[in-house]
Curated annotation (Swiss-Prot):
Residues 30-175 are periplasmic. The keyword DNA repair does not apply. Heme binds at H124, Y128. It is a single-pass type II membrane protein. PANTHER family: CYTOCHROME C-TYPE BIOGENESIS PROTEIN CCME HOMOLOG, MITOCHONDRIAL (PTHR34128:SF2). It comes from Psychrobacter sp. (strain PRwf-1). Heme chaperone required for the biogenesis of c-type cytochromes. Transiently binds heme delivered by CcmC and transfers the heme to apo-cytochromes in a process facilitated by CcmF and CcmH. Residues 142-175 are annotated as: Disordered. The gene is ccmE. This is Cytochrome c-type biogenesis protein CcmE. Belongs to the CcmE/CycJ family. GO terms for cellular component: plasma membrane. Residues 1-8 are cytoplasmic. InterPro entries: CcmE, CcmE-like_sf, NA-bd_OB-fold.
């Protein structure tokens, strides 16, 4: 093998090795940033891993919010999907929209039977429910054969575009 060919072969091998290492590092980084979602039923069943970052979502149980009298930032509350309830411990400032009987998604890890949250996100208006929570509740209601009375599970009414006067269009609700 002559020197030019050998040099090209080494260059191609080094480039290929570098590309493989870069791809593996990207895959590793994505894996580290992935947070799996668990509803309270799955957490109570023991499906959620211990001491691994996950997301948990549900409705805050009424009268479950307790603040530590010695530390104003330490809060304990419970979340439910109406099948199971999970205790949550959080150290920090809760979002302004955090309230009992409202939807939350918390990021943290399971430590024993308690979900220790590092971040708590609250719903942003009175009609919003996190998509994962809504899907979980809808599945639970379907499994029980219960039709939810809440409009939170109803699909949005499609909007039909009709031609109006001039260069604009008018939106009307389809029936």
């Amino acid at each position: 093998m002559n020197a030019v060919r050998r040099k090209k072969l080494i260059w191609v091998a080094a480039t290929l090795a570098g590309a493989i290492i870069a791809v593996l590092l990207v895959i590793y980084a994505i894996g580290q940033q992935t947070d799996y979602y668990f509803d309270p039923t799955a957490i109570a069943a023991g499906d959620a891993p211990q001491n691994k970052r996950i997301r948990a979502g549900g409705m805050v149980v009424k009268d479950s919010v307790r603040r530590d009298p010695n530390d104003d930032l330490k809060v304990q509350f419970e979340i439910t999907d109406f099948n199971a309830t999970v205790p949550v411990s959080y150290q920090g400032i809760l979002p302004d929209l955090f309230a009992e009987n409202s939807g939350v998604v918390a990021t943290g890890e399971m430590q024993g039977k308690v979900f220790v949250a590092s971040e708590v996100l609250a719903k942003h208006d009175e009609n919003y429910m996190p998509p994962e929570v809504a899907a979980s509740l809808k599945e639970d209601h379907a499994a029980k054969g219960v039709t939810p009375t809440s409009e939170q599970f109803s699909p949005a009414i499609p909007v039909k575009q009709t031609a109006g006067e001039g260069n604009h269009t008018t939106s009307t609700l389809q029936e």
